[in-house]
Amino acid sequence: ITEAGYEVDGCDDVRCFVESGFSNKDVLVFPLWRGGASRNRTAIVPAYCEARNIPFIRGDAYVQAVCQDKSLSKMMANAAGISVPGEMVLQSEDDLSSFSPSSRLRGPFVVKPLHSACSIGVDNSSLCHNDDLARDRAANLFAEGLGPVVCEEFIEGEEIALCFIEEQGTIVKRCVGTYMGIDGKSPF
């Protein structure tokens, strides 16, 4: 961006952004902030931009809130006719004592934070082949402050990303991306 002749300012938190006076400048905001413990953390900057009529790149506050909630986004995908894996949501550590994913789901299971993106809280221990491993992984996520937790059926295959560019209510560009490992194969 700077090579194209534009000035780039960065803020480490929402307060810095709000107090910076960006609303008084001719700007375009790239809301990449992912901090804080709120499940709405990716929606905060877009919501502020919308309220102040500051142009920004990425989904609006509603899109961010839906996409951050893995269970809600799967429910919406299912309502649109897209098959989704079965899941169980653990809202708190109190749910761990009765957590037995094999009673409702086909293994193996993927256990990860319910409200995160960018693979936050996902590592090799997220793929769990039995109830004990799933319970341990969920307990670790709660201990790391990454709860609520979702446990879902593992679906082998390519990871697909759908991208849309919208201008004033009209989709003007679509793209589909698939994730491949360095060997050119799907790692899943």
PLM regions and their residue ranges:
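Conserved N-proximal alpha/beta basic substrate-recognition cap immediately N-terminal to
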Residues: 2-90
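A cross-family glycoside hydrolase active-site/sugar-binding cleft signature
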Residues: 11, 32, 112, 152, ...
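Short, active-site-adjacent cap segments at secondary-structure transitions
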Residues: 17-18, 117, 158-161
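Active-site nucleotide/adenylate-binding loops and adjacent lid/helix of ATP-dependent enzymes
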Residues: 22, 64-150, 156
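Generic preference for hydrophobic
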Residues: 29, 56, 87, 111, ...
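Short, flexible active-site-adjacent loop segments at beta-strand->alpha-helix junctions, enriched
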Residues: 35, 93, 114-115, 155, ...
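Glycine-enriched alpha-helix->loop->beta-strand junction motifs that scaffold or abut catalytic
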Residues: 53-55, 106, 168-171
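Phosphate-binding site of ATP-dependent enzymes
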Residues: 131-188
